[in-house]
């Protein structure tokens, strides 16, 4: 198992409940590919460096997890399908 950080940039027009659901879905995705979440943080609504899909602000979320290395590619494919996530980045620790 390897340690990873998943940074999510989420649509700013979601309700607080919807933002929580995005975190829950991401944690579910991680578990589905064989990982285990160790920490999840909602950094809140922040201005982004450039517009994405017409938005100049977005919610930032950081999820730290451990998983087999091969699962990261599967996780990326799942995340790409989620319309609430504007951008994501997975970093191996």
Segment roles from a protein language model:
Residues 1-58, 66-93:
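Long, contiguous binding/interaction regions
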């Amino acid at each position: 198992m390897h340690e990873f950080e998943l940074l999510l940039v989420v649509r700013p027009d979601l309700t607080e409940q919807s933002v929580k659901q995005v975190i829950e879905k991401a944690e579910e995705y991680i578990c589905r590919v064989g990982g285990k979440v160790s920490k999840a943080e909602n950094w809140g609504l922040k201005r982004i460096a450039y517009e994405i899909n017409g938005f100049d602000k977005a919610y930032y979320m950081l999820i730290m997890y451990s998983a087999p290395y091969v699962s990261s590619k599967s996780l990326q494919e799942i995340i790409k399908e989620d319309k609430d996530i504007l951008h994501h980045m997975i970093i191996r620790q």
